[in-house]
Amino acid sequence: MLDMLFPAAAVLLGYVVLGITGFGSALVVVPLLAWRWPLPEVVALTLLLDVMASLLLGGLNLRQVDFAELRRLLPGMVAGALAGLWLSRSLDASWPLLVLGLYVAAVGAQALRPRPARPRPPAAAPWALAAGGAIGVVEMLFGTAGPLVVAWLSRRLPDVHALRASTPVVITVSACSVLLAMGWAGRLSQPELWTRWLALVGVAAGGVLLGHRWARHVSPAALRKLICGLLVVSGLTLIVHTLQQG
């Protein structure tokens, strides 16, 4: 039982972040749990927790979800997941991960800058196919497409609450595609994986509910700054991790 205290604390922290911002759980949970368990097992466990937690958060904010954006992204996400499945067998993941970290950090830093008198035009809808493809590839290769989802939706959705509500729904769809591939490859058949999931799923749900309650008391401007700041931290974390691995 004591062996689960550290994992439970890591999961609680990660899903409080998810409850507040709508994304970021994997970038908190995966590095911490990887200190204790093998990384492939951690990624599978985190995706299983993400599906439950993201569905819960999406249900709490269902009226604010922009399903039109999900429909635009879905074809690209499916194609990207298939491409990622092929790339995962033949590609060294270090350089695309470094590029992803640089991109995400740059998007977050740019969004934190004072807005000009004339706001930037939103990203054009036809680019959703490319954005969905990138999300599918990254989720398949790394299991951490959340920052990329936020980077796209923040250019499409001016309402920060719609952004926060729509992000976990998109993450759920991308995570499910990865889990289907993992199940086909036999990576979800270990009994220990499901034992850990049963022990931690309640902690994750509690973290989501706690973060959701705190988010109600945060102004839209502060919430946008928090989301963009987390983008910067997420990107820098990916960069440091990649350089250390190299």
Language model region names:
Residues 4-71, 129-137, 146-203:
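Small-residue-rich hydrophobic segments that form or flank transmembrane alpha-helices
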Residues 22, 38, 92, 159, ...:
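A helix-boundary/kink motif common to multi-pass secondary transporters
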Residues 31, 84-89, 151, 211-213:
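Small-residue-mediated transmembrane helix hinge/kink sites in multi-pass secondary transporters
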Residues 40, 68, 94-97, 126, ...:
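Residues that define the loop-to-transmembrane-helix transition and helix capping
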Residues 44-47, 100-104, 108, 168, ...:
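Residues within membrane-spanning alpha-helices of integral membrane proteins
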Residues 50, 77-81, 104, 171, ...:
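Residue-level recognition of pore/gate-forming positions within transmembrane alpha-helices
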Residues 54-65, 85, 93, 97-124, ...:
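Transmembrane helix exit motif
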Residues 209-232:
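Interfacial loop-to-transmembrane junctions
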